[in-house]
Amino acid sequence: MKNYFVSVIAVLFSIFGMNAQDLQSPNGNFKMIFALENDGTPTYQLFMNNKEIIKKSKLGLELQKDKKSLLNDFKLVNEVRNTFDETWKTVWGEETAIKNHYNELALTLKQNETERQIIIRFRLFNDGLGFRYEFPEQKNLTYFVLKEERTEFAMTGDHTAFWIPGDYDTQEYDFTESKLSEIRKLFSSAVTGNASQKQFSDTGVQTSLMMKSADGIYINIHEAALINYSCMHLNLDDATFIFQSHLTPDAKGNKGHLQAPCVSPWRTIIASSDARDILASRITLNLNEPCKIEDTSWIKPVKYIGVWWEMITGKSSWAYTDEVPSVQLGVTDFTKVKPNKTHAANTKHVKEYIDFAAKHGFDAVLVEGWNEGWEDWFGKEKDYVFDFVTPYPDFDVKGIHDYAKSKGIKMIMHHETSGATRNYERHLDKAYQFMKDNGYDAVKSGYVGNILPLGEYHYSQSILNHYQYCIEKAVDYKIMVNAHEAVRPTGICRTFPNLIGNESARGTEFQAFGGSKANHTTLLPFTRLIGGPMDYTPGIFEMDIAKLNPNNNSHVNTTLANQLGLYVVMYSPLQMAADLPEHYNRFLDAFQFIKDVPVEWATSKYLEAEPGYYITIARKDKNSNNWFVGNSNGYKARTSTINFNFLEKGKKYEATIYADAENADYKTNPQAYKISKQKVTNNTKLQLKTAAGGGFAISIVEIK
């Protein structure tokens, strides 16, 4: 690893006439200008290639209990400049090594009236800006409560935005594409039902927010290293096109309880004239602390199947019985009730999944609905809902563990909390120890429904601290965590790579809840995945959900070839083949791609991209010279031209191409696909047609 600092300058200012500082990126393409206004209000501007992309925007924080907030009346008392350049190795990721190169400007500001000091630290990379607030230890600012963070992001015009409604509890919305000026009138139609939701403004949107200016500049706003702070949303003034940060409140309406010394999360702006650069940016990861886990040998990417989709579609149930309307854990005797015959997490059925996983080379099997409590788990705001260790009578924990071990298959635990965070924390050590005792080294946790204690939100400070506690506690037991319904990620997986996955967006399950837009996965890599990988659970081959459950008329709004492409487009070290084994058995030739595609990558190339319309990505296997290409296409059929110049010169490869058939269409003919093979080199160019809602996948094997 390279790791060096240069040009370290500290200057004390009397600051008369010296209230503006500038910072350039290492390659000189970006320039940030900081200034204090006449009343001492901090501001910043951002330029790319001499073009303003963020207009002068105010910085500051409003305090809840103090007469004077940290908004103005500042003077500059210290300036420190650094340059930092390193290349760090990933435990897992889209590449094995990431370059972290930035110029830094740390400005100490002192408030005249209160003599309080804050530091605003800027880091300017070759692809964008990160900045945060820092609160040094001082007698005039120790314990304080945030009423609101007043960070602004002033846009230069009425950009096109790809947004979801600002919500304290969920990100599980379809994206809306509109001008900024149109958000207000479209907001109510963009809000769809969810198990728990709370909007705050009809111009409020969530990050990661993706935009495109009229002159073709792509801009992404997000945050990094969200720890012990509230999740940031953005509230738009649609008269001025200025976004202001909007933090998630707690049950009392406060936005954060802080104790100096402390820091805010980083606010990030990624920008480029090429959409592919947004996908390639590693600013979010680079702004997080290095890995804190000394031995990471137990953290391993996983390809898995699971007893899950059949419950999501309504074909099977999580609950063991229909005879118990009210479960009292430790009192209700499930051995004395009649099973409902739809309970999927039974020993015989789970062993069938284990057999399928072993036959086709998967690593693990997830089982949901194995533990007592599912009869009244949802909508009751029940605290003691699960104990995470007591199985239903038809689920033999030891027998399943022994059987899976004999087949070389790992089991993935499921901990649904029903939002009862205190109950989960009370049982966490016992639950994690139960996992270790029974051979589970990964857990999928869930937070469906309103958060308990009541009044808190999924994205408020104390609940974010709960998620972090579960991640760090899991390290003690060498357990990998895949958190669903938790806050969207902000790069913390660099620091704690046992956080191997999150959902935290509208995943595949919504295809069985009425469907998602056909261009959904052309937007997720530009938005949700900017913060970290997503357990999207692709691989659905049967698009007509009524064939699984006659009472569910949902339709999966993609083609089968698109589902294959998602294993490359939707990066995750945790990849599920989500459909039922019997559906894969009908399409074993297409299923071969899912079997072949790795979950560990050496490098990634972004071949073509336009948010909302198409994405094509090539990735090289970490453990071989093989490459894999995936495409996801939006509503309009198109032709992709694939340049194979990413392949090594002088070598020959065989490409197996899984593409939409000529008559494929996500609505009318989603299972129409074709498979072909051809020899390719780094000089090859290939044109592939994609259907509406379609895509393609290519496996490229070196010919030796």
Question: Language model features by range: what are they?
Answer:
Residues 259-352, 360, 364:
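An acidic-aromatic substrate-binding cleft motif
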Residues 677-704:
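C-terminal beta-strand-rich structural cap/linker in extracellular carbohydrate-active enzymes
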Residues 369-559:
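Aromatic- and carboxylate-enriched substrate-binding clefts and catalytic-loop regions
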Residues 561-608:
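Catalytic cores of secreted or luminal carbohydrate-active enzymes
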Residues 611-653, 696-699:
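Carbohydrate-binding surface patches
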Residues 22-295:
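N-terminal accessory beta-strand-rich subdomains and adjacent acidic, glycine-rich linkers
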Residues 349-370, 437-441:
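Catalytic domains of carbohydrate-active enzymes, especially glycoside hydrolases
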Residues 1-22:
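Bacterial Sec-dependent N-terminal signal peptides
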